[in-house]
From Swiss-Prot:
Organism: Drosophila melanogaster (Fruit fly)
Pfam name, any one: zf-RING_2
Source domain of life: Eukaryota
Deletion phenotype: Flies are viable and fertile.
Lineage summary: Eukaryota, Metazoa, Ecdysozoa, Arthropoda, Hexapoda
Predominant cellular place of this UniProt entry's protein: membrane
Name of the protein in question: E3 ubiquitin-protein ligase goliath
Length: 461
């Protein structure tokens, strides 16, 4: 019992005092940063850029979005040998996951083998601009692919299998900000960038007109951008959910152990009460000292429990069923089993203790006397019965009834305190029914005894 209390207290201490606070800024920011930049090359993304940028410690970073932008510069020769160069002052593309490379090569508008208008590169069977063959392996070329219909990973894989040095994926709709492409194969030696829809359409139209376009993918600015609001909300939601679940589990655990403790306490109390009643019944069982050879039978010359012969100095207890045992042998047996080891006679029932559904609800009544008692003893018992017809019912408290009225207190059946709410399975109405039944039984016994007394008096006269 005390061990159970100690374990419960230890659980409470570990839950409230042993766990680190979930709302500390350092712990929260570190957790979110670790979740957000998983599988990234930290040494590359967080090293000082050009000696002018540096990042604080991990504990100062919240949720971050690592970005690498790229410049797209291209040129082509128009009709009349006029060179046209397109250069932008700001980055117009963004690298996806994987290697960040600077590449210059011939731009090829990817088409499907069976459909020259399909430029999604969602199949490994691809060709060049308007169905032209793919450049040879020794030539450096860059693929132009439209976004959609399949994942970025599939598009990059298909053009990489055709020995492309880079791939430009342009959006299929207008967007304000370029997102980061999720690519599984981060070790491929290919520069994969995503650009805006208008730039991709201009490049595809230029290629479809038959111009040879040379394009360069040049690394631009890079760094991290905090997106703390979304991640803080997520962490707060997860933390609150975890705390609520822990509180619910803790309340249920406390309630469970309280109920279990009350049940065990009531069970121990009932066991002690039953043991006390059993000891009272044992005190009523007669004993004798020794058993001489002239009075012992062949079948009862030894104790059935210890299998040892009776000696003149032994204390022998005689049960109501006339079976005899050593006092030191039968008393522990009766306290535990409350029955005769040989014939299973219920000793408590014989001496007037009846169970009413549980060990706590016990009815004590005056049993019928044995047939072999003398007439004088029967007369005395009848007189005692006339003087007192008391019932002691321990449900939920001990009370005394005399002819249906409460007359006063009697020695309680159990010396220990009875709880306010009984754990018995019987209701008070059922207990009253038992009292009424036993009262009727005793009235019948009293009537029979009165008739016997009258007959005995007539015989004596």
């Amino acid at each position: 019992m005390y061990i159970r209390k100690t374990l419960l207290l230890a659980c409470l201490v570990l839950l409230f005092g042993g766990l680190p606070p979930l709302t500390f800024p350092a712990t929260t920011t570190t957790l979110v940063a670790a979740m957000s930049i998983a599988n990234q090359d930290l040494e590359r993304y967080f090293r000082p850029g050009n000696g002018t940028h540096s990042f604080s410690g991990m504990e100062d970073r919240i949720a971050v979005d690592v970005y690498n932008y790229a410049f797209l510069n291209w040129s082509y020769v128009e009709h009349g040998n006029m060179l046209c160069n397109m250069e932008f002052a700001q980055e117009q593309a963004r690298y996806g996951e994987g290697k960040v490379l600077n590449v210059t090569g011939r731009l090829i508008h990817i088409t499907a083998t069976d459909n020259f208008s399909d430029d999604y590169a969602c199949t490994p069977y691809i060709r060049g601009t308007l169905g032209a063959p793919i450049p040879d392996k020794g030539e450096t070329w860059i693929a132009l692919v439209r976004r959609g219909r399949c994942t970025f990973e599939e598009k990059v894989k298909h053009v990489y299998q055709q020995n492309a040095a880079g791939v430009i994926i342009y959006n299929d709709k207008q967007v304000m900000q370029l997102e980061k492409m999720q690519i599984k194969g981060k070790t491929r030696n290919i520069a994969a960038v995503i650009t805006y829809q208008n730039i991709g359409q201009d490049l595809s139209l230029t290629l479809d007109k038959g111009y040879n376009v040379t394009i360069s993918i040049i690394e631009g600015r890079r760094g991290v951008r905090t997106i703390s609001s979304l991640n803080r909300t997520s962490v707060l939601f997860v933390s609150i959910s975890f705390i609520v679940l822990m509180i619910i589990s803790l309340v249920w655990l406390i309630f469970y152990y309280i109920q279990r403790f009350r049940y065990m306490q009531a069970k121990d109390q009932q066991s002690r009460n039953l043991c006390s009643v059993t000891k009272k019944a044992i005190m009523k069982i007669p004993t004798k000292t020794g058993k001489f050879s002239d009075e012992k039978d062949l079948d009862s010359d030894c104790c059935a429990i210890c299998i040892e012969a009776y000696k003149p100095t032994d204390t022998i207890r005689i049960l109501p069923c006339k079976h005899e045992f050593h006092k030191n042998c039968i008393d522990p047996w009766l306290i535990e089993h409350r029955t005769c080891p040989m014939c299973k006679l219920d000793v408590l029932k014989f001496y007037g203790y009846v169970f009413l559904g549980s060990e706590e609800s016990i009815l004590e009544y005056q049993p019928d006397p044995p047939q072999g008692l003398a007439l004088v003893e029967a007369r005395d018992e009848s007189a005692d019965l006339n003087r007192s017809r008391d019932f002691v019912v321990d449900f939920p408290r001990v009370f005394v009834l005399d002819s249906g009225c409460v007359v006063g207190a009697r020695e309680m059946l159990f010396p220990c305190r009875i709880p306010e709410r009984s754990q018995s399975s019987l209701s008070l109405r059922q207990a009253r029914d038992w009292v009424s039944l036993m009262s009727n039984k005793l009235e019948e016994q009293q009537g029979l005894r009165s008739m016997r007394n009258d007959e005995m008096q007539q015989v004596i006269k």
